[in-house]
Amino acid sequence: GVADCTAQLAQALGGLLQPSDALVCPWRNDGHPDHEATGHACAEVARQVGCRLLELPIWTWHWATPEDPQVPWHRAAALALAPEQLALKRQALACFHSQLLPDPSTGKEAILPAWATARLLRPFEVVFV
C-alpha cells in the first residue's frame, strides 16, 4: 500500500511544490489506509514547503455524521465546481473500473455503489482547510 512508500511520495512532492502552491489530498484521518498514508505524507510536505494544504474527506462520508467530534468540521469549506471541472471529475472517476464495476473473479458488487458515486459527483467539494 501507500504506507510503504510515503517517503518516496513526500520526496517527489517536495521537489514539485512552492510555498505559493496548494496541495490537495485525502484527509489524513479518512478511514482508508491509503488515503490516510497519502494525507499524512502530504501534510508533512505542506508543512516543510510552507504551502497551503486542502484535505478532502472521501471515505469519511461513509462513517461520519455531521456531529462526529472526530471530524474537523470547523475547518470545512465548500468549493463550487465549474461545469468543466465537474466534467473532468466525472472522467477521472470513470477510470476507476475496480471501484465502479462488479468483480467478475469474485462475484462481488462494485466497491462504490450508485449513492457513493452520486456523492462524489456533486457540483462542489468539501475540503478541510
Regions found by a protein language model. Give the residues of each.
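Active-site beta-strand->loop->alpha-helix modules in alpha/beta enzyme cores, enriched
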Residues: 1-52, 87, 91-95, 109-111, ...
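A short linear-motif detector with a strong N-terminal bias
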Residues: 33-35, 57-60, 105-108
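Short, flexible loop segments at boundaries between secondary-structure elements
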Residues: 48-70
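C-terminal and late-domain segments of enzyme folds
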Residues: 100-129
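A conserved mid-domain beta-alpha-beta active-site/ligand-binding segment of alpha/beta enzyme cores
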Residues: 65-109
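A residue-identity detector for tryptophan
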Residues: 27, 59-63, 73, 115
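A broad, low-specificity signal marking well-ordered, structured residues that form hydrophobic/aromatic
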Residues: 53-54, 79, 125
